[in-house]
From Swiss-Prot:
Keyword Membrane (UniProt): yes
Family matches, as InterPro entries: GK/Ca_channel_bsu, Guanylate_kin-like_dom, P-loop_NTPase, PDZ, PDZ_sf, SH3-like_dom_sf, SH3_domain, ZO
Annotated stretches, region: Interaction with SCRIB: 1165-1167
Stretch list, region Disordered: 129-195, 225-286, 381-485, 904-1055, 1095-1167
Name used for this protein in its record: Tight junction protein 2
GO cellular component terms listed in the entry, alphabetical order: adherens junction; bicellular tight junction; cell junction; cell surface; cell-cell junction; gap junction; nucleus; plasma membrane
Self-association and partners: Homodimer. Interacts (via PDZ2 domain) with TJP1/ZO1 (via PDZ2 domain). Interacts with UBN1. Interacts with SCRIB. Interacts with OCLN. Interacts with SAFB in the nucleus. Interacts with USP53 (via the C-terminal region). Interacts with claudins, including CLDN1, CLDN2, CLDN3, CLDN5 and CLDN7. Interacts with CLDN18. Interacts (via N-terminus) with CTNNA1.
Amino acid sequence: MEEVIWEQYTVTLQKDSKRGFGIAVSGGRDNPHFENGETSIVISDVLPGGPADGLLQENDRVVMVNGTPMEDVLHSFAVQQLRKSGKIAAIVVKRPRKVQVAPLQGSPPLSHDDRGFEVIEEFDGRSFRSGYSERSRHSSHDMLSHSWEGNRERGRPHQRTQSRERERSRGRSLERGLDQEDYGRSRERSRGRSLERGLDRDFVSRDHSRGRSIDRDYDRDYERSYHEAYEPDYGGGYSPSYDRRAHPETRYERSRSREHLRSRSPSPESRSRHEHKGQHDPDRPIGVLLTKSKANEEYGLRLGSQIFIKEMTRTGLATKDGNLHEGDIILKINGTVTENMSLTDARKLIEKSRGKLQLVVLRDSKQTLINIPALNDSDSEVEDISEIESNRSFSPEERRQQYSDQDYHSSTEKLKERPSSREETSGRLSRMGATPTPFKSTGDITAAGVTEASREPRYQEEGPVPQPRTAPRVFLRPSPEDEAIYGPNTKMVRFKKGDSVGLRLAGGNDVGIFVAGIQEGTSAEQEGLQEGDQILKVNTQDFRGLVREDAVLYLLEIPKGETVTILAQSRADVYRDILACGRGDSFFIRSHFECEKETPQSLAFTRGEVFRVVDTLYDGKLGHWLAVRIGNELEKGLIPNKSRAEQMASVQNAQRENAGDRADFWRMRGQRSSGGVKKNLRKSREDLAAAVSVSTKFPAYEKVLLREAGFKRPVVLFGPIADIAMERLATELPDLFQTAKTEPKDAGSEKSSGVVRLNTVRQIIEQDKHALLDVTPKAVDLLNYTQWFPIVIFFNPDSRQGVKTIRQRLSPTSNKSSRKLFDQANKLKKTCSHLFTATINVNSANDGWFGSLKDSIQQQQNEAVWVSEGKMEGMDDDAEDRMSYLTAMGADYLSCDSRLISDFEDTDGEGGAYTDNELEEPAEEPLVSSITRSSEPVQHEENIRKSSPEPRAQMRRAASRDQLRDASPPPAFKPEPPKARSQNREDSFDYSKSNLPATAGSEIPGGSTKGYPPPIAAKPAFGRPILKPSTPVPMPESEEVGESTEEQEDAPRSVLGRVKIFEKMDHKAKLQRMQELQEAQNARIEIAQKHPDIYAVPIKAPKPDAGLPPHMSSRPPEPQKAPSRLYQDTRGSYGSDPEEEEYRQQLAAHSKRGYYSQPSRYRDTEL
């Protein structure tokens, strides 16, 4: 005969970062089995090598996940519970097993194949098997009720043994194997798990702890047998537990497990023995001693346990309902079968009922379970009878005499714990999100190890505590204003603070702050504060919506001896719900600093990550918050609290500032002054700038909320094809996108590139369009700070060659360096990835990036945005006020130069477009340079690299004698006539850059037709501007420059002929430069007048021309000695004109003194 039994296991799985729990589930109410329609959640696959490999098997039925029943649930609900488990999941499963069942014989012992099943510890201490059996054709619900019906028909419950009754009183199952060799007491103390023991042959079987069933077995290699009534050789005798109380003739029958009672009938002999034993007085326990005579003998016991109602309070809902009675056996709790369930698991089920508790009970008319006589542990001399100390169960009468009904808060028997163990319980339960009340479940005795003797005195001590109902307390009446705000049932207490307030708090901003414990003897206790009171206000601080950490800190900061006024309301029902569900704090934050993992429980994170904080006082201690990472994978752990986060953020900000300090500036100056490194100068500057992360105005933790944006969010694109993408969006979708125009800065501004006013962005948004912005990462952070929430998309390139290929295909006329674009993209990805809202991978093989770009923008526009919960410092609610705040000096512009911001741009002379054109950009596009100090001479090598539009190979081919002759010092320094000499001294700076490229451009055929006008004319017009570098030069001047170029080409190739041309051009450049200097001076005066406390215009006295003035540059002036030698080498080709000879002598004398005769005139341009 074959029967299907169900073995139950509890498995704890550690989640793997890559494989998860390593299982797949199927089934559910919405996905029943295709053959039999079963709705159980079934393990459909176990990943080899995963966390569940060897622990779970296919076709296992999931009964419970972390205390949540999985019976008759949706498939999605089961999957969600597994995902919410975090790193650890406790899964209870039941596994079908077929066993051979043989009919029972009279006296011969049953064969091992016909008895039950074998319990093997397969899971390394992480699983247990309850061992209750069910027929495969019945569900667990039906089987439970049928099983009890079988017990009533066959087993006669009124004749069950006292031991069986005690099993049901505790609801715990212990499985022990008794073996001659295995004396080890390896027992598993985790809740809901079975314990197996191997005991010596002399080990005397004894049930110590009343209400705990002990399933003993002789060894793993032997099967369990049935009730002792089936075995005629199970002789009697007195157990050491009862030899002093029980009489040998009064013995009761040992009860059979419900499964065997259901499936088998006792033999005639056992029936007669059963009837014989039933004649004894059922009110007296009997003692039984079982002794092995052979090593392979078995005790033949298989015990079980059951939850029953031990006591009911007078004022509880169960008593008011009238359908429940003390002694009723609970079969189901909210649909979950309670057989072999621990009290701890039963308590969890009840706590998760959330106000609705559904029970299925079996009425015990004789109330056998609650009438068990009181017994004490025997003082037997048999060594190591049991390591389990009993937890005495009092009768209802005894319990009522020792403490009142108010000590109970639920049917799960939350008993007041001892003061010595309060701290331990507080630390254990505070992880649930609230500091616990001083209550503790009787729980698992094997895990807690609490002795019966230690519990009895505690009840007797707490018994005489006066009850608050006996003497009603009259509280102070709050003010009418407080009553109007907090309600009429508010009570007020007032006392002076001692060493501490004496309160332990629970809850948080999500549910309110509650009193979780009161220190005995404190003023708070004397004034009538009670556990479960909600604190609404302390002195002037409103506690509603306050996080628990802030509430504790506020109470701690109250000075000793100061009066404390507390407004509170008694809300015990809400308080119990808080403890049951573990709710407390709940708010969202966004990090603005980096944090590494400190402890195994900590979370590592970077800037821009969002967390949900669920406990601000983790483990009852300050310093850490318990948070859940919001993202693709929910992860729970510890993060620094607000104060520690601010300290860490300030340290990181200081390190960022030190990384870009003035030491790097002087290093750049050294590179600028040394020869042979000009080519890599800009690259070094960008490397230094990229190494410094973008600074931010945000605090370390920004409280955020998920909201929808009610406007078209601005769009910022980064990457090697950002300019092309912006142009396509504005051209192909003009109804949705508009490029924000750049404007020149005011005169005297420090930055060199164009800017975008926020007012321009707002105007585009008011037109219901996306504003396309070409701004820096720092400007993006400013947009986030001002709550414009830009959509920031980064184009991630695959390789440098891919960038070059795609740009040549999309923009053939562009000559931007692919190497620079690729390097800058990598730097942005490394330092500013927290600003990106989306990333699009750019592949040179296809052009699918544009469709992805449009889809990404539309998707992000429709999605909710994490917005700041409170307004930032200096920000107003109204948009107009916010804009007026942003239009203040220094905050109303967004830099349009798409390079990383650094301190070196202020004085770095190697400015230009944000990519290095490397002599490939046409001269028609003027180079936009950074601010340059006028006192710094421009070196000859720099002019060769930056001014000439021709490649290096062409430069070498154009190295003719005329070119060498033109490389001589600028003729603008001609001493005669004196007026020309005094004027030309000021603007020699402009011509030192333009002399050599002039001849080079005129030497190359077709240079002008290709868009390369001679730099002789171009440089005085827009070379090295100081105030408005991005403003183009008026066209009439360009025409004049073109005429001067033609005149220069027809002029004689003598020095005097060239001098006349240069003097004419120098005069025009001087006028323009003087006008710019005057505008700068006016702008500085205007700024200084508006902000006298910030700005001041330096007044410098002019120095006499006599003597050598000090140089303003960090390097000494470089006299043109090498060009002079070149001039002397070629002087033979000019003839022996005495005027030329005299000019050379005066020019040489001028060169010895340096470039500038009056450097003080330029010192006012230093910013």
